[in-house]
From Swiss-Prot:
One of its GO terms (biological process) is pyridoxine biosynthetic process. The gene is pdxJ. Catalyzes the complicated ring closure reaction between the two acyclic compounds 1-deoxy-D-xylulose-5-phosphate (DXP) and 3-amino-2-oxopropyl phosphate (1-amino-acetone-3-phosphate or AAP) to form pyridoxine 5'-phosphate (PNP) and inorganic phosphate. Its EC number is 2.6.99.2. The active site is at H42, E69, H189. This is Pyridoxine 5'-phosphate synthase. Homooctamer; tetramer of dimers. It is an enzyme of class 2 (transferase). GO terms for cellular component: cytosol. Keywords: Cytoplasm, Pyridoxine biosynthesis, Transferase. Its main location: cytoplasm. CDD domains: PNPsynthase (cd00003). It comes from Chlorobium luteolum (strain DSM 273 / BCRC 81028 / 2530) (Pelodictyon luteolum). SUPFAM superfamilies: Pyridoxine 5'-phosphate synthase. GO terms for molecular function: pyridoxine 5'-phosphate synthase activity.
């Protein structure tokens, strides 16, 4: 299983003082050097953490894979096509939320989705949808032309005991179903050093995307050690 590191909260810390440090690009390079297989950033419409110049710097510097999380808007479609990350992930976005609160509502946007995706894929960019781990969302993602899905693990992260076990099984079944539908599978949201290890039991999940937990750990031990510790856990 591969590790993709979300560096949004490096930008959050920088923006707290509106100065140049810490630099998200430098953080991304440290993560790559330490074994991360990809870098994730979310260019939100309100630019609350990652900004346009960060994205340009990441595109110039990232050597593994750059995953641009974005809302389904004309502005973000244009930016994606101009920037050409290896991957874009469509996520829901609300101005009042602290972080992405759930999966992309494919049912609601389905009629526009294929047309939105088409020019992005034509630019040589893979497309992922951040979805709830259920068969209906997976079916619609496949029909819309998505290359892969990122299964939302937030509910798993918030639960404990038998409820968490049940949610894990839901994710396991969804991952297998997605692969059967011809989609590649990654997972993310709320994953941390305490709850990640069970995902080693789901071979269909090729990669996990981790941001807040890893950056929080890096505040104490540094990015290289935080990445290495997570890599040890995901095996």
């Amino acid at each position: 299983m591969r590790l993709a590191v979300n560096i949004d909260h490096i930008a959050t810390l920088r923006n707290a003082r509106n100065e140049g440090e810490p630099d998200p690009v430098a953080a991304a390079l440290l993560a790559e050097e330490s074994g991360a297989a990809g870098i994730v950033c979310h260019l939100r419409e309100d630019r609350r953490h990652i900004r346009d110049n960060d994205l340009k710097g990441l595109r110039r510097s990232v050597k593994t894979k750059l995953d641009l999380e974005m809302a389904m808007t004309e502005e973000m479609q244009r930016i994606a096509i101009e920037t050409v990350p290896e991957l874009i992930t469509l996520v829901p976005e609300k101005r009042e939320e602290l972080t992405t609160e759930g999966g992309f509502d494919i049912e609601r946007h389905f009629k526009r989705l294929a047309l939105f995706i088409e020019p992005i894929r034509a630019a040589g960019i893979e497309v992922s949808l951040f979805i709830e781990p259920d068969s209906r969302s997976i079916d619609l993602a496949a029909e819309a032309g998505s290359d892969l899905v990122e299964l939302h693990t937030g509910s798993y992260a918030l639960k404990s005991g038998e409820e968490q076990t049940a949610e894990f099984e839901r994710i396991r079944h969804a991952a297998k179903y997605a692969v059967d539908r011809g989609l590649k599978v990654v997972a993310g949201h709320g994953l941390n050093y305490r709850n990640i290890q069970p995902f080693r039991q789901i071979p269909e999940i090729e990669e996990v995307s981790i941001g807040h937990a890893l950056i929080a750990r890096a505040a104490f031990v540094g990015i290289p050690e935080a990445v290495r510790e997570m890599l040890d856990l995901i095996g």
